[in-house]
């Protein structure tokens, strides 16, 4: 086995190389990463190496040998697959690692994200929904010093940026969202999809699933005439009555 292949071969199902393949297959079946769209990157906390899904691979068929491995310090590739080129998302993933101290980033072409990008302006908003409690607030508990989640009564806000011809051209707008929304763990790209990050791949997965649930709920609320961020008890003021 070559020194490069040692980086991606492990019997541990939680090894980044194995986990990226497992999750990409799952996300394909969720209809989030079809037609080679989307991608995942995970930082190995033991080695400080970035594991990155390549460009142009069918996500349900991806294997560890398809992955790129990059040194987090030098940003040099330690391993490159023969059949694929680096994802155009790579600069965006690196920005999340460097500016948000992310441990993993998930990019999907979720239809819910695309539809919400058409329904909302500069930001996605939803309030007073239980699932919001799965999303980090960006604040720290003064007593426990642990990160705090949003509460049921909070409004989740996710910035929406405009799509570009190439994904690496999104980098300037991504940096701007980091400044304008310092507590966000996601950004929606209009008519494209969503990027979600977290301190670990487990957290990023939870955030992504919760946000997708909330976006789907927001779409259904819009269909009923209910603003997703309306106050508690105000729903019936907006509700579209079904035809008899």
Swiss-Prot record:
GO molecular function: methylthioribulose 1-phosphate dehydratase activity; zinc ion binding
PANTHER family (UniProt xref): METHYLTHIORIBULOSE-1-PHOSPHATE DEHYDRATASE
Disulfide topology: none
GO BP annotation list: L-methionine salvage from methylthioadenosine
Protein name: Methylthioribulose-1-phosphate dehydratase
Remarks, miscellaneous: Present with 952 molecules/cell in log phase SD medium.
Organism listed in the record: Saccharomyces cerevisiae (strain ATCC 204508 / S288c)
GO cellular component: cytoplasm; cytosol
Binding-site list for substrate: 89
Pathway: Amino-acid biosynthesis; L-methionine biosynthesis via salvage pathway; L-methionine from S-methyl-5-thio-alpha-D-ribose 1-phosphate: step 2/6
Residues that hold Zn(2+) according to the record: 107, 109, 192
Family the UniProt entry places it in: Belongs to the aldolase class II family. MtnB subfamily.
Reactions this protein catalyses: 5-(methylsulfanyl)-D-ribulose 1-phosphate = 5-methylsulfanyl-2,3-dioxopentyl phosphate + H2O
């Amino acid at each position: 086995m070559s020194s490069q292949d040692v980086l991606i071969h492990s019997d541990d199902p939680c090894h980044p190389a194995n986990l990226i393949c497992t999750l990409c297959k799952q996300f394909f079946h969720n209809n989030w990463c079809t037609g080679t769209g989307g991608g995942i990157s995970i930082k190995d906390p033991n080695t400080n190496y970035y594991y990155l899904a390549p460009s142009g691979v069918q996500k349900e068929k991806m294997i560890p040998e398809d992955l790129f491995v990059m040194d987090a310090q030098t940003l040099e590739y330690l391993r490159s697959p023969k059949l694929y080129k680096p994802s155009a998302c790579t600069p965006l993933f690196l920005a999340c690692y460097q500016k948000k101290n992310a441990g993993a980033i998930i990019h999907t072409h979720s239809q819910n994200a695309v539809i919400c990008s058409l329904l909302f302006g500069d930001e996605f908003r939803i309030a007073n929904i239980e699932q919001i409690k799965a999303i980090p607030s960006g604040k720290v508990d003064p007593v426990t010093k642990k990160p705090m989640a949003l509460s049921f009564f909070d409004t989740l806000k996710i910035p929406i940026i405009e799509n570009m011809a190439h994904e690496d051209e999104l980098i300037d707008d991504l940096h701007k969202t980091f400044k304008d929304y310092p507590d966000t763990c996601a950004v929606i790209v209009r008519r494209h999809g969503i990027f979600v990050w977290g301190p670990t791949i487990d957290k990023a997965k939870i955030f992504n699933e919760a946000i997708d649930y909330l976006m789907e709920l927001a779409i259904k609320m819009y269909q009923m005439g209910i603003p997703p961020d309306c106050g508690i008890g105000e729903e019936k003021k907006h509700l579209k009555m079904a035809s008899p």
